[in-house]
Amino acid sequence: MWITQEITPYLRKEYTIEAKLLDVRSEHNILEIFKSKDFGEIAMLNRQLLFKNFLHIESELLAHMGGCTKKELKEVLIVDGFDLELAHQLFKYDTHIDFVQADEKILDSFISFFPHFHEVKNNKNFTHAKQLLDLDIKKYDLILCLQEPDIHKIDGLKRMLKEDGVFISVAKHPLLEHVSMQNALKNLGDFFAVAMPFVAPLRILSNKGYIYASFKTHPLKDLMAPKIEALTSVRYYNEDIHRAAFALPKNLQEVFKDNIKS
């Protein structure tokens, strides 16, 4: 048996699996979890793959990309995703997390897949809301959007950021789909003074890129090395990974030169 990961519309990977462990369907999402000899458990959420053995890569990168470029991280908003491991990493800071996800059926089905599921859900500083309107009106230090946002969502979310707040969103991989990344950079650049693409260095099982955006905070100039050194129980993230995440090959520097704002 095998499952197929769509990297781009024209590129696919296949992974051998031993068994299907779970199949859950809701109105808007389909979650399947498989057992794999080489990769442990693999979750397929709407045709996108999550590898249980490597969940820490994205969660550490995104959490500390924001946390280590901000002096304080008091209020965090996570939208359009299910990754509770991201919240687990963010709790290394003295922060409150608002987690917006309407699909409780699918979220609760990750109970055995996310190692810190119960720890996060039971944390007194974690608030799960079905929609943004359910939350108190406030300004955030960090907003993480786990799906590529359109301009209307960007416009709405940026109004919820503090003046020195950071907005991090998922995008297409700059090497695999550079036109999509260009468009995403342009959309964010229309609202922010800083808009820079990055990837997860040495992560070979992903087709994701990301964008760091802010009104004034810079992901490299404002990086605080002492905060990185103070982090405990991290397996992936360090200062070298942080800086390397923003490195682009010569050809992509040329492609994105009119879209990157730094």
Curated annotation (Swiss-Prot):
GO biological process: spermidine biosynthetic process
EC class of the enzyme, as a word: transferase
Occurrences of domain PABS (ranges): 1-249
SUPFAM superfamilies according to UniProt: S-adenosyl-L-methionine-dependent methyltransferases (SSF53335)
Keywords per UniProt: Cytoplasm, Polyamine biosynthesis, Spermidine biosynthesis, Transferase
Residue positions binding S-methyl-5'-thioadenosine: 29
Subcellular location, record wording: Cytoplasm
Enzymatic reactions: S-adenosyl 3-(methylsulfanyl)propylamine + putrescine = S-methyl-5'-thioadenosine + spermidine + H(+)
Physiological role: Catalyzes the irreversible transfer of a propylamine group from the amino donor S-adenosylmethioninamine (decarboxy-AdoMet) to putrescine (1,4-diaminobutane) to yield spermidine.
Family, as annotated: Belongs to the spermidine/spermine synthase family.
Protein name: Polyamine aminopropyltransferase
Source organism (scientific name): Helicobacter pylori (strain G27)
